[in-house]
Amino acid sequence: MESLLKLEHVTICYNGEPVVHDVGLELNKGEILGVVGESGSGKSTIIKAIMGLLGNEGMVTEGDIWYKGKNVVDMQEKELRRLLGPEIAMVFQNSGSALCPIRTVGDQIYESMREHERISRKECAERAVRMMAKIGLKDGERVLQSYPFELSGGMNQRVGICISMLQNPALLLADEPTSALDVTIQKQVVEEMLLMRKEYGTAMIIVTHNIGVVEKMADKVLVLKNGKVREYGKTAQVLTAPEDPYTKELMSSVLRLKRTGTGNGGR
């Protein structure tokens, strides 16, 4: 079976300086990969490269990123844009910053949906309100009529998650999707993302500091330090019996936090 996503010996540079070195990973339909590591380790850079969002300063200088057998690195911008939404969607760490401040949430959701499917504004609103309810946004009608600056950071985060989920992408890339949410809402979001995988076979890459989220969701884990892969394997193996010294140190620090009742599952 051909993998949905495959990175082969990928090196990424910003302004000529390597920030990710020789990374490889593979993801099949319905699989979830957790990417963990300290801040600045290159976690977010990898998913930005998959989306073609490295900006003018960033570039994949070595290796290939294959999506359904096509090399994303070689794609023209127009071809890549066709993938974004119905094929590949992203939840940003700060979804509020990705929303337009002078347009209502409803307008922005409708625009993102109609780019990829024929849908009426009414149907779009109904689907959005249902999705919002599932991830803890109870007053969906009011949210649709609001501007992003009228909502809290946690509410904007859930709006971003809602937009991504509504498009039922084959691949969902999530950068700290639960970081701005309280524990109860985190649980709802995680459960809804797992339901997406069950119903639609959605594959996911979850970038997070929260080891509890990885433990709950991920089939595989990739551990990064200074842009290099330190460990990559099945979740149970990496979390409970890591081989790399850095991973052992990371997991032991998480265990200490759990025992003392501080932290947020490794965050």
For the regions a language model picked out, list residue spans one by one.
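A short, proline-enriched helix->beta-strand linker immediately N-terminal to the Walker B motif
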Residues: L166-A170
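ABC ATPase "signature
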Residues: V229-G233
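Conserved ABC transporter NBD signature motif
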Residues: M59-N71
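The feature captures the beta-strand-to-loop junction immediately N-terminal to the Walker
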Residues: V36-E38
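A short, surface-exposed alpha-helical micro-motif characterized by mixed small hydrophobic
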Residues: V214-K216
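Helical segment within the ABC ATPase nucleotide-binding domain
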Residues: K187-Y200
